[in-house]
Amino acid sequence: MVKPLALDETTLEAPEWRISDLPVPYEEAVKTMEARAAAIAEGTAPELVWLLEHPALYTAGTSADETDLLDPKRFPVFSTGRGGQYTYHGPGQRVAYVMLDLKRRKPDVRAYVQDLERWLIATLAEFNVTGETRPDRVGVWVKRPEKGLTAEDKIAAIGVRIRKWVTFHGVSLNVEPDLDHFSGIVPCGISQFGVTSLADLGHTATMADVDLALKKTFRDVFGRG
């Protein structure tokens, strides 16, 4: 079992879980995250895990290279303060925005990102999908031997921002998005590997199924959920 982040179970409330049924505009989501992260830092709001979908769009992280935006007119493009490069969000992709107080858990950015990866891998395992990490590539990957001995596709992306030791932004897991929508960018600046989804791998899963798996596995990784 994954060792949870160190925390004081007696004083830290379980995070609030929020699920948005309708697609949330990106700018609205960022404003909501920033406000909630500030409130968490001030001690006036509990931690939050927010599950949602966005309308089709591209976001550019702080390391984005403009040459990786191959089709800038295809979908709206938003510059964002999260780490990473270009990524796609849209219908059929579960986005989990995670707002946690690392001061009260463990003030270690690398450990936090690794725990996000472990959370995604544990969630995928609920659907009998083996997710893996790579030391030189953030995110979660699956091997595709039917495409070649060394073929791998990305199934989940990670991009975080931390302010006053409170996290926001988070992860995206491809459930059944239109994978062609990724062709307008070089996802995460990595051109030699593709993208996949649960549906592409032959696994039928609803968003409700994925949400249940995310919540079930959260506590094993983060220690409170």
Swiss-Prot record:
The active site is at C188. Its EC number is 2.3.1.181. PROSITE patterns: BPL_LPL_CATALYTIC, LIPB. One of its GO terms (molecular function) is lipoyl(octanoyl) transferase activity. Pathway: Protein modification; protein lipoylation via endogenous pathway; protein N(6)-(lipoyl)lysine from octanoyl-[acyl-carrier-protein]: step 1/2. Keywords: Acyltransferase, Cytoplasm, Transferase. InterPro entries: aa-tRNA-synth_II/BPL/LPL (IPR045864), BPL_LPL_catalytic (IPR004143), Octanoyltransferase (IPR000544), Octanoyltransferase_CS (IPR020605). It catalyses: octanoyl-[ACP] + L-lysyl-[protein] = N(6)-octanoyl-L-lysyl-[protein] + holo-[ACP] + H(+). CDD domains: LipB. Substrate binds at R82, G83, G84, Q85, Y86, T87, Y88, H89, A157, I158, G159, G170, V171, S172. It is found in: Cytoplasm. The record marks K154 as: Lowers pKa of active site Cys. It holds the Pfam family LplA-B_cat. Residues 43-225 form the BPL/LPL catalytic domain. One of its GO terms (cellular component) is cytoplasm. Transmembrane segments: none annotated. PANTHER family: LIPOYLTRANSFERASE 2, MITOCHONDRIAL-RELATED, OCTANOYLTRANSFERASE. Catalyzes the transfer of endogenously produced octanoic acid from octanoyl-acyl-carrier-protein onto the lipoyl domains of lipoate-dependent enzymes. Lipoyl-ACP can also act as a substrate although octanoyl-ACP is likely to be the physiological substrate. Belongs to the LipB family. In the reaction, the free carboxyl group of octanoic acid is attached via an amide linkage to the epsilon-amino group of a specific lysine residue of lipoyl domains of lipoate-dependent enzymes. This is Octanoyltransferase. It comes from Parvibaculum lavamentivorans (strain DS-1 / DSM 13023 / NCIMB 13966). The gene is lipB.
